[in-house]
């Protein structure tokens, strides 16, 4: 929930709105659109000249749209996706296209009841430790669609598992913060 709120502020809110609209349009053909999005994202963001062409405010939008339509035909992309990207260009939001696609994938996972999990540990974990952490998460929240592992020595030990509104803080640093909070409330009456 918190990550959703943070994501929706500023340009993130714009990206969210466009992604939501795309998801609403392609709900029945989401799998094929996902593959097309990966292709479009690679084609439009990998090459610096292509990015510069679409980001250049002097280049007429009609020229940009013509290039997109030609790309759509040559790559056999769906009219829906080509139309979506053309609307993004017409609205002057091409710089947010990659964010829109990222939001789309997050929203699609939510619609399917899936979630992305990030596990943070103080040092790299063994396969057995990872399996144990995942079993804790699975027992309470279900199977994560993706798992990202991060190492942060500042947590001192244990782990922190995050996914949208879910946070399991079993880190030593988290326990120390909780101990400090309880101690203050006992000593200070706060």
From Swiss-Prot:
Belongs to the ATPase delta chain family. It holds the Pfam family OSCP. SUPFAM superfamilies: N-terminal domain of the delta subunit of the F1F0-ATP synthase (SSF47928). GO terms for cellular component: plasma membrane; proton-transporting ATP synthase complex. It is found in: Cell inner membrane. PANTHER family: ATP SYNTHASE DELTA CHAIN. F(1)F(0) ATP synthase produces ATP from ADP in the presence of a proton or sodium gradient. F-type ATPases consist of two structural domains, F(1) containing the extramembraneous catalytic core and F(0) containing the membrane proton channel, linked together by a central stalk and a peripheral stalk. During catalysis, ATP synthesis in the catalytic domain of F(1) is coupled via a rotary mechanism of the central stalk subunits to proton translocation. This protein is part of the stalk that links CF(0) to CF(1). It either transmits conformational changes from CF(0) to CF(1) or is implicated in proton conduction. Disulfide bonds: none annotated. Keywords: ATP synthesis, Cell inner membrane, Cell membrane, CF(1), Hydrogen ion transport, Ion transport, Membrane, Transport. It comes from the Bacteria. This is ATP synthase subunit delta. GO terms for molecular function: proton-transporting ATP synthase activity, rotational mechanism. It comes from Anaplasma marginale (strain Florida). F-type ATPases have 2 components, F(1) - the catalytic core - and F(0) - the membrane proton channel. F(1) has five subunits: alpha(3), beta(3), gamma(1), delta(1), epsilon(1). F(0) has three main subunits: a(1), b(2) and c(10-14). The alpha and beta chains form an alternating ring which encloses part of the gamma chain. F(1) is attached to F(0) by a central stalk formed by the gamma and epsilon chains, while a peripheral stalk is formed by the delta and b chains. It is a peripheral membrane protein.
């Amino acid at each position: 929930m918190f990550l959703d709120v943070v994501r929706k502020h500023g340009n993130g809110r714009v990206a969210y709105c466009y992604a939501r609209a795309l998801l609403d349009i392609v709900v029945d053909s989401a799998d094929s659109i996902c593959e097309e999005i990966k292709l479009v994202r690679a084609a439009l963001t990998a090459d610096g000249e292509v990015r510069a062409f679409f980001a250049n405010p002097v280049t007429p939008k009609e020229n940009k749209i013509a290039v997109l339509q030609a790309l759509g035909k040559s790559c056999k992309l769906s009219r829906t996706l080509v139309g979506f990207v053309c609307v993004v260009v017409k609205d002057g939001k091409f710089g947010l296209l990659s964010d829109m696609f990222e939001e789309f994938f997050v929203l699609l996972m939510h619609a399917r009841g899936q979630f992305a999990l990030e596990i943070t540990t103080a040092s790299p974990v063994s396969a057995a430790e990872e399996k144990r952490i995942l079993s804790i998460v699975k027992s309470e929240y279900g199977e994560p669609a993706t798992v990202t592992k991060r190492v942060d020595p500042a947590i001192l030990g244990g782990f922190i598992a995050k996914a949208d509104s879910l946070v399991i803080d079993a880190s030593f640093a988290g326990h120390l913060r909780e101990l400090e909070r309880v101690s203050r409330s006992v000593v200070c009456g706060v």
